[in-house]
Amino acid sequence: MARATVVERGEYFLKAVVEGVPPSLVNSLRRVIISELPVMAIDNVVVVNNTSVMYDEMLAHRLGLIPLTTPLQSLPPYEDCVSGLADPSECSTRLTLQVTAEGDTTIYSGDLASDRPDVVPVYKDIPIVKLVKGQSIVLEAYAKLGVAKDHAKWQAATASYYYYPKVVVKSENCREMCKEICRQLENPIECSFNKAWTCKDLCKEGLEVTWDKNKYVFWVESFGNYDVNTALREAFRILKRKFAVFAEELFRRASVETKV
């Protein structure tokens, strides 16, 4: 029976023990989280004036990598934005920056003003560029929904998993030898499979390390665009849609071959 037990969680982080499912399904979820969760990111920049020491291209690149809050509940599905079913204006927004330095100053991500109050920089203290007295920057930046398989600036989260390790300590000396690597050898949450195997190399026959092929420690961490609950909910929605599209195409082709 498939089951997931949460062992650690926060607003943007979750670690769980997953069991009763094949590794292909767990890996599919991991891949969707990493590369197919939609988030807002700056994609086009119109520079009106830039007298700083930074080239326009580098400035635009930095702006693109600033994570933006993404209210998925009030945005159209990403697939509708790509297909044209949704109004393009609902899938994008504008941010502006207009600064003239009165002295030595640093421009931060928090200085960007957004047309949408729910799409703003996640972190306000990301440095963009330094200005000296008299220098100025005036620009418009246009953010849109995207996914990380197209560009890393649209990556919403990272995820990983490892097989649930089964560790048997046969020598107490092994605990002392491994205390710097893993203090709780028999705790698979605190001691990952890789750490346990490193200890195995030290302890030799004093430690037995195997794994459960249908049990995993899975973790996901959001970059702040939205919380981990939203990330998982969207990942499962995308995964279900992929299964539905695959099944529909499979049945269609099977039907065509049967008629022939």
UniProtKB/Swiss-Prot annotation:
Any one GO BP annotation for this protein: DNA-templated transcription
Q: What is a single cellular component term in the Gene Ontology annotation?
A: cytoplasm
Q: Gene3D superfamilies per the record?
A: 3.30.70.3110, DNA-directed RNA polymerase, insert domain, RNA polymerase, RBP11-like subunit
What highest taxon heads this organism's lineage? Archaea
Which PROSITE patterns does the entry link to?
A: RNA_POL_D_30KD (PS00446)
NCBIfam families to which the protein is assigned, alphabetical = PRK00783.1
| Name of the molecule in the record | DNA-directed RNA polymerase subunit Rpo3
Where does this protein come from, organism-wise? Pyrobaculum aerophilum (strain ATCC 51768 / DSM 7523 / JCM 9630 / CIP 104966 / NBRC 100827 / IM2)
High-level lineage: Archaea, Thermoproteota, Thermoprotei, Thermoproteales, Thermoproteaceae
